[in-house]
Amino acid sequence: ALFQKICSKENLKKHVESGTSFNTATGWMEVQKRIRKSNNWERMIKILSYAAAVLVPVFFVGISLKYTTHDYFSNKSVLIAQPILPGAAKAILTLDNGETINLNKETADALQTIEGTNIQIDSTTLNYQLAQSTSVSPKPVYNKVEIPRGGEYALVLSDGTKVHLNSMSSLRFPVAFTTGKREVELQGEAYFEVSKTGQPFIVNANGMQVEVLGTTFNISAYPDEEYQTTLVNGSVKVSAEKGESLILKPSQQATIALGSNSIQVRTVDTSFYTSWVKGKINFKDQRLEDIMKTLSRWYDMNVVYENEKLKNIRFGCNLNRYEEITPFVKLLEKTEEVHVKIEGNTITFHN
């Protein structure tokens, strides 16, 4: 019984995962206690022989496991050929005439003037500045900024409104706002800091419409996910495509489920939903599939599930948005609920 207890799979795993080899002194003390309880010399000889058989091999097995196998248990089935790196600032600007410009370091400091608006491009931000000395055409001229997988980019509109676009997102907007309202079209996710000009600012996002005067909010409107508007400060009006409309207060979030025209409102910690703008990615009790949708857009990677049930396992974690994905993978492995294999830019989950 003593041998089985010491060498059981659970006991060895316990010592190996804690980074320690088997404690021979503790094992010997346990043997001695049993010896003292027995007055039978033959039984003592038998126990001593068991002890010798147990302690000597286990001592060396423990040392061997500590220095040669501990990494295996720590990483279990993690296979990483090369690290999957985080995204970076990159985008494509499409002008009204169809011309496209890659927004990266090579196009930094490029300066153009379109319909009386100066466009300043640097490595992370696209800045539209209305040239006061130039007349603006009454007909709106539109530009579009598209963010690929593994990208993000910041944008300052001609009215001073700041927009931070997330991966796989796009914003279509007028170079200069010429009518009584400011209106843009969003797909994906963006964080808005709307300047106060007295004119309504309207965001059309896949059937959801958000109207404000001057405020800070986050919109997530990816085509395969529910639509969310999270209000940081100010006031916004949220409207479903063919349904109700309502006014949000600060710290409230409006959600429209896919295929629905009803709006659900709840109070939230807004920093949780806007942390991506500040270099963090937070998850709280979320399905693995939903977590990986977010991460795959940012890390530009493919995700495979060998067992469909793994998609519904729930996790929570806080990540540095600008680190490679390895720390996250190790966190998943420690739960022992899922194992991970990484090959190229594909991450595979299995039992």
Predicted regions and their residues:
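Short helix/strand-capping connector loops at secondary-structure junctions
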Residues: 8-16, 309-316
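Generic detector of short, aliphatic-rich beta-strand segments that form the cores of beta-sheets
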Residues: 3, 28-35, 254, 347-349
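Extended, solvent-exposed functional surface patches
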Residues: 56-58
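Positively biased amphipathic helices and basic secretion/translocation or surface-docking motifs
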Residues: 12-46
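A residue-level detector for the "anchor" residue at the start of short, highly conserved motifs
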Residues: 39-50, 60-351
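N-terminal amphipathic alpha-helical interaction or autoinhibitory segments
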Residues: 1-8
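Prokaryotic Sec-type signal peptides and long signal-anchor helices
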Residues: 7, 19-22, 26, 63-64, ...
